Amino acid sequence: MASSLVAWTQTRPTSGDDGDDRRGARRWWLLWSCLIAIAVLIGSLVSGNTLRHQQSFSILDEGAHYDYVLDLSHGHIPRSGDHLSQETMRAISCLGAYNQPSHGCRITTRNPADFAAGGYSYEAVDQPPLGYLPYLLTARPNDAPRQALLAARWGGFIWSVIAAAALIWAGWLAALSLLELCAVLSISLLSPVAVNVSATVTNDSSAVAAGAFVLVTYLVARRRDRPLLVIGLLVGVLTGLMKGLFVVAPFTLLVGVVLADVAARRKPTKATFVSRYGCVLAMTVGAIVGYGAWIVLVDARAVVSTSVVLHALQGFSTTGHVRPTTILNGVESELSGLIAWVPAPLYWIWNLAVYGSLAGMVVLQGPVGRPQLRAMAIAIFVGILALAVAFPVLNFAEGHYDFAVPTRYALPLLPIIGYVLARSLRGRGLLVIGAILPALAVFDQVYTNQF
């Protein structure tokens, strides 16, 4: 029975000797991959259920993100200088927020000056609208504040479903076995950080989906041996219009392709440059151009300068220079993508196993460190370092703020991390990292009611 179970987990969409066998294997693989994805999504749903039902607004600037969604639901894209709507201020006053207790649910006019950042809708300063679109399907602004917030939060789970579908597509393109696909899905969707944002009103809930579609585009280009410049550019622009820092996903793939060529001592000629780098370069440039164009539009539409709105966010520490410790804190944060916010030893072990395996691929030679995957593992660490440097530099430029990059900003890398580990590890190692540890971590979290 054990041998048959192992054989089942090794089923791939390309199995079979002839046409009929291959079609049967593909249907079988697709059926089981969907069932595995459903199981992982249920795990994500159960794990995030308490967060989804918490009464107050989350620490993740949920009040400002919620206001952005309400504006979109009324057909208005918020501008820099817009104040929080009366609906949002009433909800925050009624439910409370992080470090802001409830002040009652009376239906009276609220004063924006009584709220954070002078009552400005500060997410309008730099957030594009695409990451909020699923929330428009679930938002019910006319309901009572608690019911309205609970309904809106389900938009984050829609992003998780979209991400799962994209990851199945990536598994199909890469001919992953069912166990390998399970590992990719688990690492991407059962991360406590991913679960948290999927249970919250925030555009960070689109991060895993963004990384998954970037990975799919890369795999399609590689499978067809075509640069797919237009498609790559379009995917990049859409990624940038979800969130600017999501550029880390195509940037990491670009670095991985370059490092693989360096390791293989391959020098692309003019004739092969586009075919080798075209797709990932187009996605990277597209994300930068898309987000850059959005910032230009934000400045053109602003009723109050973005710098004024940012300076209204009181209480943030400032610095005369970008501090190395801030960058190091960011690196530490980005390497904690599978760690829960509450004491949860199994998540710590899972996190150590995942990032330790990546580090092992970098330093070891042989099958686990074969050039292409080893190059991609190095690229992941380069992407993490790039985020840790770019975020405080951007915040310093905006107002000498001293911010380390939050853990959730590395979420677009999870599909790439899962893919690299799935293609590198074999047998028991993959079973432990991709199935046993995440399942035990979620079970322990639910059993102990630690969220």
PLM feature spans:
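Start-transfer (signal-anchor) and selected internal transmembrane alpha helices
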Residues: M1-G48, F57-L60, S275-T284, G429-G434
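Interfacial juxtamembrane loops and adjacent helix segments
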Residues: S73-A152
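Transmembrane-helix motifs of polytopic, lipid-linked glycan transferases
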Residues: L150-A175
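Specific aromatic-rich, kink-prone transmembrane helix
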Residues: A166, S206-R223, V235-G236, I416-I417
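Short acidic/glycine- and proline-prone juxtamembrane loop motifs at membrane-interface regions
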Residues: N196-A207
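Perimembrane helix-loop-helix junctions
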Residues: V220-A221, V230, A249-V285
